[in-house]
Regions:
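Nucleotide-activated chemistry modules centered on ATP-dependent adenylation/adenylyltransferase
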Residues: 1-137
């Protein structure tokens, strides 16, 4: 998604976007995130990029090193989503445990959905997503 798209959609609801890390390299951002002692866990992966084994992993240096070369270390292209549970801005860490992992295939019955998951020739194709439950500890 482009910055213009975001600005236009925010304007529709009377908001103005501020983008302090726009165009900062993801490799730099993830190293800063890890160095600052933030804790984050992967709660969803796009199966076109990452398999079930990545769901439930803590984002740390080992996680970043294990990513395929074409996966953004911050998940900026939709490769994965995460939940931040600890860090210097948290009053206290969120206690949780990783629960069940489930796979949800995409249902391409609506033209609007199908058009968003049909990549350019040669690009990876998303068939579904892996999720994990994050349960109170």
């Amino acid at each position: 998604m482009t910055r213009l798209w975001r600005e236009q959609n925010l304007a529709l609801v009377g908001l103005r976007g501020i983008f302090p890390v726009w165009k900062v390299a993801s490799n730099e951002l993830i190293q800063e995130f890890i160095s600052a002692k933030f804790g984050s866990v992967v709660c969803c992966t796009n199966d076109a990029y990452l398999d079930e084994s990545f769901v439930g992993k803590t984002i740390d240096a080992d996680f970043v090193a294990s990513l395929p070369a074409d996966v953004d270390p911050c998940g900026e292209n939709g490769e994965f989503h995460s939940f931040a549970f600890a860090g210097p801005i948290f009053k206290e860490s969120v206690k949780f445990q990783v629960g069940e992992k489930v796979y949800r295939p995409l249902e391409e019955t609506h033209p609007a959905v199908a058009s968003t998951v049909c990549p350019a020739p040669g690009a990876r194709r998303t068939k579904g997503f892996w999720f994990c439950d994050l349960l109170p500890a």
